[in-house]
Amino acid sequence: DDVVCFWKPDGEYQGWRNTLHGGIQATLLDETAAWVVFRKLQVMGVTSKLELSYRRPVLTTDSQITLRGHITEQKRNLAYVELTLENSKGEVCTTARAVYYLFTQEKSKENGFTGCGTEDEELLF
């Protein structure tokens, strides 16, 4: 199942007039991929590779955008994450594929990661 994030764009993040800058879109998708790894695998990870396809403009005047991501594969210390950025109409504007290098649970704890739960959930660490 997907990790879902919501964000409200505004004019200070535009590249072209009323259009969300592609670098901001990349940042949002990369950050969503990180939360997918944190939440689903309960370890830290860092971006190894990020590929984006810009399919349609994202308007900074849009009321809200939705970011979705899920793990498609995990091999050893790598997680493969597929992501979408949708406008308020539910149209897919940008897609991304990320490869995340995964830290071990021990290394994650050494770096201060204690797990990623929800407000109504108790983590068993």
List each language-model region with its residue ranges:
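Hydrophobic residues in beta-strands and at strand termini
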Residues: W7-P9, Y54, L102
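HotDog/MaoC-like acyl-thioester-processing domains
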Residues: V58-T61, I71-F125
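A generic structural signal for beta-strand entry/edge sites
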Residues: D1-V4, Q64, L78
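Short amphipathic alpha-helical face segments that pack within enzyme cores
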Residues: I24-L28, T32
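Hydrophobic beta-strand-centered segment that forms part of the acyl-chain substrate-binding groove
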Residues: T32-T66, I71, R97
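Catalytic strand-loop segment that frames the active site of acyl-thioester-processing enzymes
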Residues: D1-L20
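A short beta-loop-beta micro-motif enriched in histidine and acidic residues
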Residues: T19-I24, L41
